[in-house]
Curated annotation (Swiss-Prot):
May have a vitamin D3 hydroxylase regulatory function. Belongs to the amidase family. It is found in: Mitochondrion inner membrane. It comes from Gallus gallus. Keywords: Hydrolase, Membrane, Mitochondrion, Mitochondrion inner membrane. Gene3D superfamilies: Amidase signature (AS) domain (3.90.1300.10). The keyword Protease does not apply. This is Vitamin D3 hydroxylase-associated protein.
Length: 464
């Protein structure tokens, strides 16, 4: 009866074009207003995050200034000039104090940040960690070494944002495993660094904390997605940083900023306590790893990380310690190399670096063998790109819900969110003219079924 009465009231109204027009206009206005309100809430959250960062950096600056005033004789320039290995030795022997090193790097990090906008948070617990380190019975391999941490790696009492609004306000209750291990080895995590929104980008910008610049050339990007790490370390504000890498996110910032970086073998380091906008990816394995100024620093970091504490905290990590004998061995090796892979065009500087490295290795007694990577188009398009976007980029697109897309990501995001059918049609149209773009579009459609996903896992894991 109620429905019948409602229909009796509404029935004559549907026939009136003025009513229909008013309903349509009202609905459209409601949609616009809701969208504006949503954007306003997003902007408010971002402003709150920026205020929190500014307050944290003010606290950091006060701490660094206070130490400098109380210890005017601190040899800051000397401390900042030392390599990580040299600094570790001086800290262990006691000729330098952990306080002098930490506050020297805090001051330098602030200076670098003012130039290139690379630091997004001060890990205030570093001062407590400083006291704990001094009380450790055995000095760890990273005793007193300040370490910078990429944004999305959890630190107790801090937010891991991934450059996305949806993660703001989620203060972590405990450290990630890698941060716990660093602390157990005497390291002092002291700042978190900037990243691009979602981290699937080779620049370093997000709408929350802004654009990070390359300290070597402010007109250039530091690379991504561990761009904040690259910028801070290259600017001298950190000795050692922990980044992450799926498709070059450690290696590219290292290259762009003149540093050394390592993406370890998959599952070599625990990823417990690390957030990501893409989950469930098994064909292409992302990994945490170090960025530093030289190879010896990377080796020291890996030696410290691959310890019993890591294996205890995360039993899924293979309990294989760093092999010092292999690392220090002078036994001649047989090493393959190539200057071009047939897919990516190398710059002249890249070719020159390969040639110089080849020459040095030959002079050291190693056998250097040229080779061409096999099936490069198939590997890049079908295994790598389709492996990252097996779901047709659905997880990545979903991560932007309730957020605003960074202008630097607009074209990338618009491609991801195209329906699979549209991507396939565009791939067919573009194939005769731009075959590589066509293959990329096809790969972005994903694998399509569980069977295809399993087939792809097999193709990645087994040579054929």
């Amino acid at each position: 009866m109620t429905l019948e009465r409602l229909w009796q009231v509404l029935d004559p109204l549907w026939a009136d074009p003025r009513v229909l027009s008013a309903l349509f206009c009202g609905s459209a206005m409601a949609v616009v207003l809701l969208k504006r309100l949503g954007h306003r809430r997003i902007q408010q959250k971002m402003e709150e995050a920026r205020r929190a960062r500014d307050l944290a950096l003010e606290r950091m600056e006060k701490a660094a200034r206070r130490f400098k005033q109380e210890n005017p004789g601190t040899q800051t320039a000397h401390i900042l000039s030392l390599t990580m290995v040299e600094l570790a030795e001086k800290l262990k022997e006691g000729s330098l104090s952990p306080e002098s090193v930490l506050y020297s790097y805090m001051g330098k990090a602030l200076e670098v940040n003012r130039e290139v906008n690379c630091v997004i948070d001060f890990i205030h617990g570093c001062e407590d960690q400083l006291q704990k380190v001094k009380q450790q019975k055995e000095k760890g391999l990273l005793y007193g070494i300040p370490v910078s941490i990429k944004d999305h790696i959890d630190c107790k009492g801090h937010v891991s944002s991934a450059g996305l609004v949806k993660f703001l306000g989620q203060v972590k209750e405990e450290d990630s495993v890698i941060v716990q291990v660093l602390k157990s080895q005497g390291a002092i995590p002291f700042v978190k660094t900037n990243i691009p929104q979602t981290m699937i980008n080779y620049d370093c910008s997000n709408l929350i904390f802004g654009q990070t610049l390359n300290p070597l050339n402010h007109q250039k990007t530091p690379g991504g997605s561990s761009g904040g790490e690259g910028a801070l370390i290259a600017g001298g504000g950190s000795l050692l940083g922990i980044g992450s890498d799926v498709a070059g996110s450690i290696r590219l910032p290292s290259s762009f900023c003149g540093l050394c970086g390592l993406k370890p073998t998959g599952f070599r380091i625990s990823k417990l306590g690390v957030i990501s906008p893409i989950t469930g990816m098994n064909s292409v394995i992302g990994m945490l790893g170090p960025i530093a100024r030289d190879v010896d620093s990377l080796a020291l970091c890996m030696k410290a990380l691959l310890c019993e504490e890591m294996f205890r905290l995360d039993p899924t990590v293979p309990p294989i310690p760093f092999d010092e004998e292999v690392y220090t061995s002078s036994k001649p090796l047989r090493i393959g190399y190539y200057e071009e892979d047939g897919y990516f065009q190398p710059s002249p500087s890249m070719k020159r670096a390969v040639q110089q490295t080849r020459k040095l290795l030959q002079e050291a007694g190693h056998t250097i063998v040229p080779f061409a990577p096999p099936k490069i188009d198939y590997v890049v398009d079908e295994l790598f790109t389709r492996g990252i976007f097996s779901d047709g980029a659905a997880h990545l697109v979903d991560s932007f819900k309730g957020d605003i897309v960074d202008p630097n990501l607009k074209s990338q995001f618009n491609t991801y969110k195209l329906p699979a059918l549209v991507k396939r049609i565009l791939a067919i149209i573009l194939k005769p003219i731009y075959p590589r773009i066509a293959r990329d579009l096809s790969a972005l459609c994903g694998v399509g079924s569980a069977k295809n996903l399993w087939d792809q896992h097999t193709a990645v894991g087994l040579p054929h």
